[in-house]
Amino acid sequence: MSSGQNSGGLMSSAGLVRYFDAEDRNSIRIDPKTIVAFGVLFGVGVLVLNALAI
């Protein structure tokens, strides 16, 4: 591999980072605490269902 093939990697990824960091007014905004709470409730629900199935 020559060093000339990998010269544009950082420049092309910088555009993607800028694209995904852009705020969109119409996007769904979910608080990270809500995601953690949902995950905990889901895990507890799975444990309860496993306990009832035995």
From Swiss-Prot:
Key words, A-Z: Cell membrane, Membrane, Protein transport, Translocation, Transmembrane, Transmembrane helix, Transport
TM regions (residue ranges): 32-53
GO cellular component, one term: plasma membrane
Segments in the Extracellular topological domain: 54
Main location: membrane
Topological domains, Cytoplasmic: 1-31
Presence of the UniProt keyword Membrane in the record: yes
Biological processes per GO annotation: protein transport
Disulfide bond entries: none
Topology term for the membrane: Single-pass membrane protein
Protein location: Cell membrane
Pfam families in the record: Sec61_beta
InterPro entries reported in the protein's UniProt record: Preprot_translocase_SecG, SecG/Sec61-beta/Sbh
HAMAP family reported for this sequence: SecG
NCBIfam families, alphabetized: PRK01253.1
Oligomer and partners: Component of the protein translocase complex. Heterotrimer consisting of alpha (SecY), beta (SecG) and gamma (SecE) subunits. Can form oligomers of the heterotrimer.
Function: Involved in protein export. The function of the beta subunit is unknown, but it may be involved in stabilization of the trimeric complex.
UniProt family annotation: Belongs to the SEC61-beta family.
Protein name: Preprotein translocase subunit SecG
Species annotation: Haloquadratum walsbyi (strain DSM 16790 / HBSQ001)
Gene that specifies this protein: secG
